[in-house]
Amino acid sequence: MAELTTLARPYAKAAFEHAQAHQQLANWSAMLGLAAAVSQDDTMQRVLKAPRLTSAEKAATFIDVCGDKFDAKAQNFINVVAENDRLPLLPEIAALFDLYKAEQEKSVDVEVTSAFALNQEQQDKLAKVLSARLNREVRLQVEEDSSLIGGVVIRAGDLVIDGSIRGKIAKLAEALKS
């Protein structure tokens, strides 16, 4: 995984810098999201792995599938990625681009797993507190997992806050073992 990220980083950075310079972050995010989805399609995977096809043929096929969703710069980007046999990296490129975009926009996706359903008021309050703590705009994705017994687990990038009963029991069990 780390190797794929390392290979994808220069492409994501180049796309981000271009999109930022031309104030097209949302457009490029959508185009790269589409490219990532197309590259993961089973039929497209076979095309990308076909040894008989040249890089230019793979790029042309890829662009044909995407139709008019790509502007000239995006088509050029796909051609450059294809020349270097990196089309299978498009999901990683899109993910890194979205990370750069979120950093630029000072926003973060936060995954909240709760033992019980959170009502809108609780979600709004949690988003407000997390926004203040992280100094970013917070977009919550709330899931329910009854195995937590009680409390919540919050994931924002590398930050994990485990306020669940299950987590506390696991810590207590670990402390008793040592």
From Swiss-Prot:
Q: What is the similarity comment for this entry?
A: Belongs to the ATPase delta chain family.
A Pfam family name for this chain? OSCP
Record keyword Cytoplasm present: no
Q: Where does this protein come from, organism-wise?
A: Pseudomonas fluorescens (strain Pf0-1)
**Record bears the keyword Cell inner membrane:** yes
- Residues crossing the lipid bilayer are none
Q: What is this protein called?
A: ATP synthase subunit delta
The record's note on quaternary structure and interaction partners says: F-type ATPases have 2 components, F(1) - the catalytic core - and F(0) - the membrane proton channel. F(1) has five subunits: alpha(3), beta(3), gamma(1), delta(1), epsilon(1). F(0) has three main subunits: a(1), b(2) and c(10-14). The alpha and beta chains form an alternating ring which encloses part of the gamma chain. F(1) is attached to F(0) by a central stalk formed by the gamma and epsilon chains, while a peripheral stalk is formed by the delta and b chains.
